[in-house]
Structures are given as C-alpha cells and as structure tokens.
C-alpha cells in the first residue's frame, strides 16, 4: 500500500501532468488539422499524393473499457472469449511472391530490390485473432468509437483519438488517487490452484485491448496465450493499407503505434551462463 505522502506526491505530479497534457493535445491537434488539409507530402525528394481516405478500413472496433482498465469482474464483461477465434498466418496471408517495384531514393537506403522474394504466409510473426469472425481495430479510436461515438476515420482519426485520451488519462489518475484507500480490500487476496478450466482477463492498455488467457490445474500452468493490441491490429492495419501510395504506407502503420522490434539480438547461453552463440537479426 502507498503512504499518504506518496499519494499526495502522485496527485501533485498528476495535476502538473494535466497542464502539460492539455498543451500537448492542443499542439498536436493543430498539427493534425494541418496535415489533413494537405494534398501531398514529400518523401525522398518526391511529391507523393496524400489521399483524404488515407488509412480507411471497413473493419469493426473492439474495446473492453473506456480507459486503461477492465470490466472482467462485472456482471456483463466488455470482452467475451466465446466471440474470439484464432487463424494461423499461413491460412490468412498471401503466399510466395516477389518485389516488382523499387525506389533507391526512398529513405533510408532505398527499398528492397526488384525480384526480392517474399512470403507473408511464412514470414508473418503473429497469429490472426478474430472477434465475431473478423479482424478488429483496438486502441484509442476503438475506445472512443465504442464508448463516446467518435467518428473520425483513417490515419488522422487515430492520431486525433490518441491526443484526446491524454487529458482523459490524467483525469482518471486524479480520480483514482482521490478514491484510493490504502486499507481497502485487495481484489486477489489468494493464489488459486486452478481446475484446468479457461481463465481470462481483457484489460485496456494505451495501445488497445490486451487479453491474457490461461489454464491452470493444481498450481501448474497448462496453457497460456496473450492477445496483445498489436496482434489484434496487424490484420486490420493490412486492410487499412489498401489503396494507399506505397511511399506513405509507413504513415498508416505508425497510426497503430505497433509494438514490433526493429531488430532482435538473440543470445544463447549454457548452464554456466556462458554465451555460446549470438546473432543480430534486422
């Protein structure tokens, strides 16, 4: 539990942060408004058309709570495991192909050369979670669409929603600190040993709905799966790229704030913690 002094300090910091959040929101909304009016952007020294429908898709939205929390223990939870299914990437994405267009002037270092082999079926690194049989978008816009009737579409709609959440987040922190009771009962006051049935929790994180599923029996984990926001968003992001000039594809992808590694440093150690192999993968 936190001391009263710690709660007071966090409260003061949250109040300071609220002022900064309003400044950040106003500044970024002005920047986004300017971008929405543009007909083109410059990429690699070339003018590229900027569609008004950049990042549009016709998929649904999913959110379990209006802010960074959950409704798992409510009578009517905001997420239902019966509505979720998983599809393997090799059953979802296209098979082998090759790059047919290249631009050496594209930042940074140019694009992949013509003829480069690709195979999304085998190279995709995540499964494809579906809700009610279809891909969904999760994240700031999904929360505002679900709970506040937000209707801004496309890439700019995602950025606008993210800015609007800044202040809501700080207000939520302040309200939580006002209600905090260090002597209150904890939600999980014991460690369940489990009977092998499925347990789950769907919590809203900044990037979107974060679902964890587990089966535990006699204190041992039998099954564990994480459906993190980026995993939900990848299939929808792919569809949002349809029709966009390839030079601005990165703008669409970044609208989802994907949690993906730019590079992976793999290290293999033995029982004596001696490094026996390592590889840097980009």
Where are these regions (language model features)?
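Active-site bordering "gate/hinge" segments
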Residues: 1-207, 218, 230-282
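Short beta-strand elements
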Residues: 210-228
């Amino acid at each position: 539990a936190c001391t009263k002094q710690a709660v007071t300090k966090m409260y003061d910091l949250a109040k300071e942060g609220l002022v900064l959040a309003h400044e950040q929101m106003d500044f970024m909304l002005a920047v986004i408004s300017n971008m929405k009016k543009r007909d083109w952007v410059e990429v690699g020294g070339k003018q590229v058309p900027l569609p008004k429908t950049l990042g549009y898709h016709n998929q649904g939205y999913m959110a379990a709570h209006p802010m960074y929390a959950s409704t798992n223990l409510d009578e009517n939870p905001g997420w239902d495991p019966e509505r979720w299914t998983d599809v393997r990437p090799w059953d979802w994405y296209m098979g082998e192909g090759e790059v047919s267009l290249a631009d050496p002037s594209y930042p940074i270092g140019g694009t992949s050369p013509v003829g480069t082999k690709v195979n999304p079926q085998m190279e995709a690194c995540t499964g494809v979670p579906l809700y009610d049989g279809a891909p969904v978008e999760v994240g700031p816009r999904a929360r505002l669409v679900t709970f506040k009737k937000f209707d801004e579409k496309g890439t700019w709609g995602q950025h606008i929603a993210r800015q609007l959440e800044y202040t809501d987040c700080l207000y939520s922190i302040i309200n939580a600190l006002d209600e905090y009771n260090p002597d209150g009962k904890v939600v999980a006051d014991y460690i369940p040993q489990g009977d092998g049935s499925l347990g789950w929790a769907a919590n809203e994180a900044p990037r979107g709905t974060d679902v964890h599923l587990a089966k535990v029996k006699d204190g041992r984990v039998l099954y564990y799966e994480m459906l993190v926001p980026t995993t939900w968003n990848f299939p929808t992001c792919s569809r949002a790229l349809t029709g966009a000039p390839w030079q601005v594809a990165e703008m669409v992808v970044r609208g989802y704030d994907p949690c993906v590694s730019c590079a992976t440093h793999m290290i293999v150690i033995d029982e004596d913690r001696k490094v026996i192999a390592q590889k840097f993968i980009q």
